[in-house]
From Swiss-Prot:
Homodimer. Its EC number is 3.5.4.2. This is Adenine deaminase. GO terms for biological process: adenine catabolic process. Belongs to the metallo-dependent hydrolases superfamily. Adenine deaminase family. The gene is ade. It comes from Klebsiella pneumoniae subsp. pneumoniae (strain ATCC 700721 / MGH 78578).
């Protein structure tokens, strides 16, 4: 008899009173996700399994009895879609944080690692998270790259790669299908990817930003079953009515009041509403929380606490096909959270497999890295750069006027056109404009750096550089001064990746991320401190204007699968037409000026 079968047999015996429980939790108020009730009950646990949920005081036979003193007992919280890499922590350090907050299971789309390392990146995700107390369900990334032909990442995934990964038992489905255009227009690659998911019988996650009407229906017809890219309350309702599981995410908090108000108009809240974090940086994760912070926001905006908790427990378990999770019921896994109040959720105690793992925000036992797993390093294949590499030039004209296409906006980008002066072939930056610069870092082609004008970010006072840039994670630098841009970029090349700020010839802040150019090997608290410092100091370089022009927008400046213009390692791209666009519209030569001032690009 297997060990699991033995535990189940012991649980049956304990439930019948034929043998004692291993652990008996008494004086609890059960948050019943099946009925919506809050009711007094005791919970008997055998091994990692709940054996019995029974009236208070009806059983006393247990090897250990622990009183919850009237605390609210909930199933462990679940995050149905997360890019764990956004925490910039390896899996064991990430687990140490979220477990103390009550998150006991996550569905991890490691497409950031996959875009750098290919299948080996997904293998690292599986191996590094296999024996964690956190239940980590890994997905097979479908977006490597997210937009073929418009960008080049470290690998290319199609049907064969998906079949390989979906054959691993630890891989639970197809990660968010971002190439909406390819799905809707029947690209061979996307048909292979989605069909591999359908053949596996596993989940197929969606990314349906902006889809509506016939296109939304077509996207579902292809086999996609969820979406976390909600843009409004109306969008959420349309997708719910269409049959998608909607995943309300915490990374767009400004949408939550309207989404909650819309949900409260419905006569029934179905099981097809879950919650996810998607992306949470380390300082926010440590100081405010992941799923727990999102649930508290939903409650603040008027959603009943039991409904919010159901989204993160029973609904999530149904979505993720984890029928051993999501309920406090006999036969389910004893991953449990104790709250003192449902008005503001704070995890008092966290149990994993029936063992007390965390109390009052503190982990009782450190989590060791997976044995025999070597984190991938040395992934920035770029030689040191010079200031001259960061100059925007116009071919075919020495002195004159050029009309250029450019990127407008920080998050939802639009096309713009502007006339600029050209001196010695170099564009003179207009007032209110900055530069965006991208260079391929995976060693798959030797293309020259791409550079374009950026409007809507103000006049950056220095430079911001990152090797964590959705979704191909090439090296990206924003700025106006070529010397500062080179300084920030070279800092990252030397450290193996990360983020850096430069101003007036000095590095203002730097967070090294030597693991795949996106993860740190620092303790979580120290990484959070460094990241917070970089975020705070970034306001010396950029004038932030929430909700769109924010620090987080740096990471999405090259996300070519979204509508509008974006700059990638292959050039200026258009998300609608799926074309690479020449930024030069027209130019004309004029007599050479007699006044040769220093050019505003800082070279």
């Amino acid at each position: 008899m297997s060990s699991n079968a033995q535990v189940r047999r012991r649980a049956v015996q304990a439930a019948r009173g034929e043998s004692p429980f291993d652990l008996l939790l008494i004086d609890a108020q059960i948050v019943d996700m099946a009925t919506g009730e809050i009711r007094p009950a005791d919970v008997g646990i055998v091994g990692e399994m709940i054996a019995s949920v029974h009236p208070r005081g009806s059983r006393e036979d247990a090897h250990e009895v622990r009183s919850l003193a009237g605390g609210y007992l909930s199933p462990g919280l679940m995050d149905t879609h997360v890019h764990l890499e956004s925490s910039h922590l390896p899996p064991e350090r990430y687990a140490e944080i979220v477990l103390t907050q009550g998150t006991t299971a996550v569905f991890w789309d490691p497409h950031e690692l996959a875009n750098v390392l290919g299948v080996a990146g997904v293998r690292y995700a599986v191996d590094a998270s296999r024996h964690l107390p956190l239940q980590v369900m890994v997905a097979a990334p479908s977006s490597v790259p997210s937009t073929p032909g418009l960008e080049m990442s470290g690998a290319d995934f199609a049907g064969a790669e998906m079949e390989t990964m979906l054959g691993w038992p630890e891989v639970r489905g197809v990660a968010e299908v971002m190439d909406m255009h390819g799905v809707l227009h029947g690209s061979e690659r996307m048909q292979e990817i989605v069909q591999a998911g359908l053949n596996s019988g596993k989940l197929i996650e969606g990314h349906a930003r902006g889809l509506s009407g016939a296109d939304l229906q077509a996207y579902l017809a292809a086999g996609v079953t969820s979406d976390h890219e909600l843009t409004s309350a109306d969008d959420a309702l349309e997708k719910l009515r269409a049959g998608l599981t909607i995943e309300i995410r915490g990374s767009h908090p400004y949408l939550l009041p309207d989404i909650v108000a819309a949900l409260k108009t419905l006569p029934h809240l179905s099981s097809q509403i879950t919650v996810c974090t998607d992306d949470v940086p380390p300082d926010i994760l440590l100081e405010k929380g992941g799923i727990i912070a999102l649930l508290n926001l939903l409650i603040e905006h008027g959603l009943p606490a039991v409904d919010a908790l159901r989204f993160a427990t029973l609904n999530a378990a149904i979505r993720l096909q984890r029928h051993d999770l999501g309920l406090i019921a006999a036969g389910r896994r004893a991953d449990l959270v104790v709250f003192d109040s449902l008005e503001k959720l704070v995890a008092r105690e966290v149990y994993i497999g029936g063992k007390l793992l965390a109390r009052a925000g503190n982990l009782l036992t450190p989590i060791a890295p997976a044995a025999g797993v070597t984190p991938p390093r040395d992934t920035l294949q770029i030689a040191p750069l010079r200031a001259d590499d960061f100059i925007l030039r116009v071919q075919g004209i020495r002195h004159g006027i050029a009309r250029l296409r450019h990127i407008r906006g920080a998050r939802f980008t639009q096309w713009g056109e502007v006339e600029v002066q050209v001196r010695d072939g170099i564009v003179q930056l207009p007032a209110g404009f900055s530069l965006i610069w991208v260079k391929h870092r995976h060693g798959r082609h030797q293309a020259t750096p791409q550079i374009a004008l950026l409007e809507g970010w103000g006049e950056l006072r220095g430079a911001i550089a990152t090797s964590y840039s959705h979704d191909s994670h090439n090296l990206v630098v924003l700025g106006r001064d070529a010397n500062d841009m080179a300084l920030a970029a070279n800092q990252l090349i030397a450290s193996g990746g990360g983020m850096a700020l430069a101003q007036q010839g000095e590095i203002l802040a730097h967070v090294a991320m030597p693991i795949a150019g996106m993860l740190s090997d620092l303790p979580a608290a120290e990484l959070a401190r460094q990241f917070r410092e970089l975020r705070d100091l970034s306001s010396q370089v950029a004038d932030w204007e929430p909700p769109y022009r924010v620090f987080k927008a740096i990471e999405g400046t090259c996300l070519a699968c979204n509508a509008g213009p974006h700059l990638t390692d292959l050039g200026l791209t258009d998300g609608g037409s799926r074309q690479i666009v020449d930024p030069l519209i027209a130019c004309r030569e004029i007599p050479e000026p007699t006044d040769h001032n220093n050019n505003p690009q800082g070279a």
